Amino acid sequence: MAVISMKQLLEAGVHFGHQTRRWNPKMAKYIFTERNGIHVIDLQQTVKLADQAYEFVRDAAANDAVILFVGTKKQAAEAVADEATRAGQYFINHRWLGGTLTNWGTIQKRIARLKEIKRMEEEGTFDVLPKKEVALLNKQRARLEKFLGGIEDMPRIPDVMYVVDPHKEQIAVKEAKKLGIPVVAMVDTNADPDDIDIIIPANDDAIRAVKLITAKLADAIIEGRQGEDADVAFEADIQADSIEEIVEVVEGDNA
């Protein structure tokens, strides 16, 4: 059975693509139809490809892979942080700093500085420093935590990267490809899928859609690490004519 059901995808709005004028023709094979100026994603393919992504991530986790979640848009930031943390992995949910992967040595120095400031506070150094200096240190720590807090304890460059919206995260994807890191991504109808190793055709602008897919990949990691079977999605009342039902839903929602 599928790890995510058609019903779950519909309820989360995963089928809504972008306006047709904003599409990337390379996504044509993942589009079922167009309604009212909006592309409708073929959820039968999403179900199948989500299964492939789940298996890939689960197997990677079973081999102790380091997995980095990336999603810096506001719709993704919370889910990326929450689900990566739940799975015991790492995340970047604010601006991607150029060179995060390709210049890992420099990033490690910034992380070391973050840890140093934290240690200074824990050891009571802040108590003997001038208030102005403490304020500057706190400001520096806040900035470092914002951009690097999610990878503070990442032991090495990741083995796998999961991305929400590779169109927005082009720099991150390019760095991963340069280093040979496989990329799993939620890919909307406006994105270029060429640099993505495992594509999940999906609406990457809806919070519920991002949460659904991201949580399922976190489940895959947990299953891979712990050997626990994740919940399997049952199709309930959406079966063979599901694509036609998708069109009806889209027409209803855009009427």
From Swiss-Prot:
CDD domains: RPS2 (cd01425). Gene3D superfamilies: Glucose-6-phosphate isomerase like protein, domain 1, Helix hairpin bin. InterPro entries: Ribosomal_uS2, Ribosomal_uS2_bac/mit/plastid, Ribosomal_uS2_CS, Ribosomal_uS2_flav_dom_sf. GO terms for biological process: translation. Keywords: Ribonucleoprotein, Ribosomal protein. One of its GO terms (cellular component) is cytosolic small ribosomal subunit. It comes from the Bacteria. One of its GO terms (molecular function) is structural constituent of ribosome. Belongs to the universal ribosomal protein uS2 family. HAMAP family: Ribosomal_uS2_B. This is Small ribosomal subunit protein uS2. The gene is rpsB.
